[in-house]
Amino acid sequence: GYDTSFYDQSGVALLKKDDNKLGGLYQHAETRLEESPIIGELSIKNAADLPEFTGFDRYLYASGGARVEGAELTATLIEASGFEKVEGLVTLSPLDNGTYEINGQTFDKVILSCGAWLGQTLEPLGFEVDVRPQKGQLRDYFFEGMDTGRLPVLMPEGELDVIPFAGGKISVGASHENDQGFDLTVDGTVLASLEEEAKTYFPDLS
């Protein structure tokens, strides 16, 4: 077996700026249950059930919502696949017999899962795709003695999420920056903006 502690089905609380629209969101989620039973049980609850959070009166709760440490998930999937992992820049060249050459090796089929690099991978082959990098910044906070592990993920309407983890950790974000390319430089202005928005829902960040 594999360690799956990076995944925790903590539930999710979804918010609407107009909470009268929660009923419609509930009905939409219900229609998805048959094909996605992992959504879990659905209910509209009062904010009093989540005293740690503020800024709303009601929320839609889905018990199947979960938080995940993405890097650990990726590493586990790669390990479980049993495939050889080769790190580095690759080039893809189609051959006349319908196969593909990648860095000196030949393959019958190729699955491209290169995310934001898809465009530059396909460009030499004459393809254009509307795929671009999007920079996403998160900010982590740690609260000593706070039982954050029992809290659900909070998803207000918009781009911000408040993601509690066990051990007093709270993550807020992410930013969705379409004009930064592959620049991974931390932008303090963006992080300050995320914090200010998150305080609406989790005042303990102050």
Roles of regions detected by a PLM:
Residues G1-E52, F56:
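Dinucleotide-binding Rossmann-like beta1-alpha1 core, especially the glycine-rich loop
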Residues K21-L22, V68, L92, W117-Q120, ...:
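Glycine-rich nucleotide phosphate-binding loop and flanking beta-alpha elements
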Residues D3-D8, C114-S206:
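Active-site substrate-recognition segment that forms the wall
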Residues N103-K109:
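Core beta-strand elements of the Rossmann-like FAD/NAD(P) dinucleotide-binding domain
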Residues L15, L92-P94, D161-P164:
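A structural signal for short hydrophobic beta-strand segments in well-ordered beta-sheet cores
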Residues E84-E101:
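A conserved short coil-to-beta-strand element within the FAD-binding core of flavoproteins
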Residues K17-G23, L60-E79, T185-V190:
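Short beta-strand to alpha-helix junction loop
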Residues A80-E84, Y201:
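A structural motif corresponding to the C-terminal end of an alpha-helix
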